[in-house]
């Protein structure tokens, strides 16, 4: 146990209402949400206690808290979700209240009950509300009784896969198979036929048992072309309840949200009001008191149907905070302390637009499979306060006088909620999300442009990550137009993400910037080349830049302010910037517009990453370019007759054996990583010649599971 540090001194112990406020709260969670809660508690003058497993001994949330208590091994079922261990930490530290964050014990009524029995406040809703809404079968019945629109489905208990197939066929495909106690995309499968229903039932049941300790499954009709829109509610213990607008969460992968925004580009004020009033009605029906979220699916005609109510703080809560100026964590603490809401429904104004991008430790080039390892480089973009949160004095941990980075527009805000740091480890034991990057702007276009620039400025090395994919989405026509559904990723990237190709104008801007950067590097090389006086190495002005299958001849005319790049076809670009050789981030300006490039060194040029593109850029003299065209490129090894493990994980099941004939799409093996089961399927008809791995084996990336003839 680590004791209180200097940050624990001189904290006030009263609320804004004059009531006595908690002196110390414990956060029963880890990662970015634990850090987020600590920030608001610190602002309120409340001391904080972190809990940590073996894997999190050096984690950021442990360093930020005033005290920290070790609670066990890395596995969550031996540490973070063991109620007795959290209760021991409370007794050791004298914490008066507990914030559960999200996941883990946040929606476990037994945990709320244990806290109540110990006289410790739960910074969340009453046990009864958690029980009622935590069971998806019960919650759907209650929602219907409260006048909330619901999706048709089967709410009874399902005993086995064959019964699941029968029920699915009766409802009519497609269906959604869901864990009754589920959340976070775990224990959920869409089935389009009997075989998928059979497989989906078993996988959902397994994931539900391992993640929630409850393997009950229900099935409901899957609404095709749906949007996922949720309403944020906030209620106190005195019967007051309001809604804080909606969040659009339709950009999802395997039912896991990836990008969220507020407000939704699809809603109109009338529909927003209907959804908000239904959400409030449901909250009041279960005597809700805290922050909570009512999730809906919506079809193209704006018909909406209840999905579930999350009785906790949502991952994506920052976008609501950014457009309303309301600190939801602070409100949760005040409600738990017995305060009456100081905000009425008429006080809620939605100002501007906010977007959140979830940075995941996953490899988009390997179909978004989890990645683990050490963060050898982790440099988020500079945070900058703006908008309602700043106006209301509710922005946390960003100095009022914070200077915007060159790539930022000072009318937009940048916020990064994270739980990691450079040099830290990304573990296989927990959720792969490592940061939530948010931007706010007066309009959706402003927030989008702010996000594009912030993503380009975000430096991450050492693990696979989805930054390129997030950047690609920000420029995708369907996303920029707001014409999105929950099927967006599956529809637009059916074979996974293979990077993007920059359009011609963007490609020329990058080529011009690289030519200017190359001149800076050439001048440096000339100065340290060791040549004799009066025989210095000359830096020419004629260059060829090759990238993305194209090459451009150009002239570089440099001056003190930058360089003018003249292309052979007569087009010119004016380039300036502060890049020096060795910098891994180049903040350039091309024709008056910012251009942020991640820069790596390769032989004869640069590796450039920008706007979702990963480019190998070669800058050569005209003679070098002529010779390069004659050089053959090395081919990658042939792995087409092998099934490779796409991520570090555990082989849960082998579905075939040596000598088996397999068909395209047939399940070959199931690998579990980061609490998710991944079914690996045959890409084509083949015969299994050799099995190289067994059930229970732990595999690394690209380990050979089986071979084919």
Enumerate the language-model features and the residues they cover:
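N-terminal beta-alpha lobe that positions the nucleotide/phosphoryl donor
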Residues: 15-294, 298-317, 323
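Catalytic cores of soluble metabolic enzymes centered on carboxylation/carboxyl-transfer
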Residues: 279, 318-573, 667, 701-707
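Conserved nucleotide-binding/hydrolysis modules and their immediate coupling elements
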Residues: 327, 558-563, 568-585, 589-596, ...
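Long, charged amphipathic helices and adjacent flexible linkers at domain junctions
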Residues: 343-351, 491-493, 497, 531-532, ...
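Structured functional modules or segments
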Residues: 635-709
